[in-house]
């Protein structure tokens, strides 16, 4: 019994010594200054927010780059964004044979602006009133590398 008690006491001392030895290196904590993101605006050409435009104007805007700036007109770089093209397509009811209009959505994620040539061509071939071009989840970076969301940009063709 004496042997077991001595063995347990020795193990306890050994565990205590190793646990206290690990506490000597303390981790350094870095504190960051709070950052209040400025109010950003997303523009394409001279348009921002939700705008009604003609298909001809939309065609000319497709080749332009998205611009992100704050209220003081400081430019920000685009980290990424999503683009959605909601187009009008015809569908046929198989039972009645009647053709009706509905919408189809094409969307993708991009990291550079303007849109790639392939996407510009896909959108340009069918631009009609009632369709939508939507830039959303626009993420901008400032000069210090901080990321922030910029407002969405939506074009409705009429």
Task: Show where each model-derived region lies.
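Contiguous segments within soluble domain cores/interaction surfaces
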Residues: 74, 78-100
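Generic structural motif
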Residues: 6, 11, 47, 71, ...
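Contiguous beta-strand segments within globular domains
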Residues: 27-84
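Short beta-strand elements
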Residues: 25-38, 145-158
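A generic structural signal for short, solvent-exposed coil/turn residues
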Residues: 11-13, 75, 147
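Mature extracytoplasmic or organellar-lumen-exposed domains after removal of signal/transit peptides
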Residues: 91, 95-157
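Bacterial Sec-dependent N-terminal signal peptides
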Residues: 1-26
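General structural signal for secondary-structure boundaries
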Residues: 14, 52-58, 115-116, 150
